[in-house]
């Protein structure tokens, strides 16, 4: 009688959904009951209280836990897409694991199967293979431990320096901050490039698009910006530091290797994370890499620090997403891109933000790169990203081949919010420059048709040519903001109007060397005050005049 009661108690304790419980678990329960029956004689000799306590101990000591895993089987596999049957409770964008050890991500949740994109070579998977849920949405390691490292789209180290030591992980697909935590852009993000910092200034928390044809210097602007942050990151003021994340999407491995070497030579890798999903990587990894890099940048933003992320380039991410979507049988739209390709980029770029003080005051600045075909900015992806971002730096092939580098088209380039973040000193010297350059371009188009030009027009042309020369800058040689102010001051105030255009670059190099070596106090004053006072203006005028007299002589 006792053994029957014990068995009944054990069965009642088991889950009601008997279908989920393995037969082994039930069998072990009945074996335990039989063992109780065998020792019944011994139990009858003891007292009732002692007997019940022994029963409790034995029942509680029995391990009735069952490890349940939801698994499915591969129905078909090809082109990096697996159709899986049986994962009834899988979540969207959940990581799944194949029996070969490969990982994948569930994207299409259909009534009778799940469409899984494979992170790797699908030749290792065959029909009938078991697929199991991991229960985790795709996440990556984040934290300062990643600085100086090169990782793949899943956050695994690929630089041969051992595993990443970070204990913190973060989902790749987090929602962008709402309206309340944000604040308007107000701090400058200095690129060290004269043409950008003076004409299309960028603020911390801004999204500024770099757009242009191939081989026009888009990546160079991004790399110069990273190198320029060394002057701030070498200091001790955490508020001035800017951590950098460079996401390489669909590039050649040799290109990424050269880039890492360039950053290492400039001593910039120590504050930079490189996320690489090269052309030979699977399309899902190229799709995922920008989101992974963004999560790494958000760690700094949400901890009251400042970060810069460069997506190079989002055109290739859109192509990878188009490939996945078409293979998943999603309906194509314009240029065969799926209908949600706008959302693909908007949900990524909206995560760049300047947070208010109640939320730590951190920022994440985004510099997405888009490659155009023959300068066509009216194509689908370029127009999408232009409408999402807070401005664009437009690079032209024609200017590049004329030797104007960086090849920025000042007329088409704009920064919608950056002027609020521009330093006052730069506003004072560069305020009229954009207008003068615009007038120069307009007049230059007509000047080639006739030679009879009035003095004012000739003056406009003369000034425009010299300002264009002044904005030229070598690759990997970013300048401090106070040095830019000194050089642009000489051009805008007309001191270079009588100098031959061919001598402008030579003058600039000599003048900068002179100012840095002889007038460091003035540069320090401009840097500290953030503006040109009357005394600084008079001093600058004196320095430029005296130097020009000696330079021309």
UniProtKB/Swiss-Prot annotation:
Residues bound to ATP: 215, 217-220, 473, 475
Protein family according to the UniProt entry: Belongs to the ATPase alpha/beta chains family.
Modified residues (Phosphothreonine): 134
Topology of this chain in the membrane: Peripheral membrane protein
Tissue: Fetal lung, heart, liver, gut and kidney. Expressed at higher levels in the fetal brain, retina and spinal cord.
Modified residues (N6-acetyllysine): 123, 126, 132, 161, 167, 230, 239-240, 261, 305, 427, 434, 498, 506, 531, 539, 541
Modified residues (Omega-N-methylarginine): 204
Protein name, per record: ATP synthase F(1) complex subunit alpha, mitochondrial
Superkingdom assignment: Eukaryota
Other remarks in the entry: The siderophore enterobactin (Ent) produced by enteric bacteria binds Fe(3+) and helps bacteria scavenge iron ions from the environment. As a consequence, the mammalian siderocalin LCN2 plays an important role in defense against bacterial infections by sequestering iron bound to microbial siderophores. LCN2 can also bind iron bound to endogenous or nutrient-derived iron chelators and plays an important role in cellular iron homeostasis.
Modification after translation, per record: The N-terminus is blocked. Acetylated on lysine residues. BLOC1S1 is required for acetylation.
Provenance organism: Homo sapiens
Compartments (UniProt record): Mitochondrion; Mitochondrion inner membrane; Cell membrane
């Amino acid at each position: 009688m006792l053994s029957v009661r014990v068995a009944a108690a054990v069965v009642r304790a088991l889950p009601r959904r008997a279908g989920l419980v393995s037969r082994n678990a039930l069998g072990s329960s009945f074996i335990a009951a039989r063992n109780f029956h065998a020792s019944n004689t011994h139990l009858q000799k003891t007292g009732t209280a002692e007997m019940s306590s022994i029963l409790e101990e034995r029942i509680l000591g029995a391990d009735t836990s069952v490890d349940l895993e939801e698994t499915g089987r591969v129905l078909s596999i090809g082109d990096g897409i697996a159709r899986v049957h049986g994962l009834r409770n899988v979540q969207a964008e959940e990581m799944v694991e194949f029996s070969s050890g490969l990982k994948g991500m569930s994207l299409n949740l259909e009534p009778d199967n799940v469409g899984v994109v494979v992170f790797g070579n699908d030749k290792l998977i065959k029909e009938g293979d078991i697929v199991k849920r991991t229960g985790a949405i795709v996440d990556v390691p984040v934290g300062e431990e990643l600085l100086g490292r090169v990782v793949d789209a899943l956050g695994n180290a690929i630089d041969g320096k051992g595993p990443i030591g970070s204990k913190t992980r973060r989902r790749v697909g987090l929602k962008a901050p709402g309206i309340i935590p944000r604040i308007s852009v107000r701090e400058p993000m200095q690129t060290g490039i004269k043409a950008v910092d003076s004409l299309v200034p960028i603020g911390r928390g801004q999204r500024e698009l770099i757009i242009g044809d191939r081989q026009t210097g888009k990546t160079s602007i991004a790399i110069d910006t990273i190198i320029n942050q060394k002057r701030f990151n070498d200091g001790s003021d955490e508020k001035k530091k800017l951590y950098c994340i460079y996401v390489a999407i669909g590039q050649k491995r040799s290109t990424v290797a050269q880039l890492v070497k360039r950053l290492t030579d400039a001593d910039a890798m120590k504050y930079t994370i490189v996320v690489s999903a090269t052309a030979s990587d699977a399309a899902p990894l190229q799709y995922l890499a920008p989101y992974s890099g963004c999560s790494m940048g958000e760690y700094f933003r949400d901890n009251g620090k400042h970060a810069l992320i460069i997506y190079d380039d989002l055109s290739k991410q859109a192509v990878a997403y188009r490939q996945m979507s078409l293979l998943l049988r999603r309906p194509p739209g314009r240029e065969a891109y799926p209908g949600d390709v706008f959302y693909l980029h908007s949900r990524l770029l909206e995560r760049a933000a300047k947070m208010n003080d109640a939320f730590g005051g951190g920022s994440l600045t985004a510099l997405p790169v888009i490659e155009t075909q023959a300068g066509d900015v009216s194509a689908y992806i370029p127009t999408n990203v232009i409408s999402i971002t807070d401005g664009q730096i437009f690079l032209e092939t024609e200017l590049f081949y004329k030797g104007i580098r960086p090849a920025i088209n000042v007329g088409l380039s704009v920064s919608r919010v950056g002027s609020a973040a521009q330093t006052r000193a730069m506003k004072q010297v560069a305020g009229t420059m954009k207008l003068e350059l615009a007038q120069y371009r307009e007049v230059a188009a007509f000047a080639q048709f006739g030679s009879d030009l009035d003095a004012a027009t000739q003056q406009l042309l003369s000034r425009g040519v010299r300002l264009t020369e002044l904005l030229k800058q070598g690759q990997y040689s970013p300048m401090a903001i106070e040095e830019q102010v000194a050089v642009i001051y000489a051009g805008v105030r007309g001191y270079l109007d009588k100098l031959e255009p061919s001598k402008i670059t030579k003058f600039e190099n000599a003048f900068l060397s002179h100012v840095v070596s002889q007038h460091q106090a003035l540069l320090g004053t401009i840097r500290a005050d953030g503006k040109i006072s009357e005394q600084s203006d008079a001093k600058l005028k004196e320095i430029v005049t005296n130097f020009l007299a000696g330079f021309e002589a």
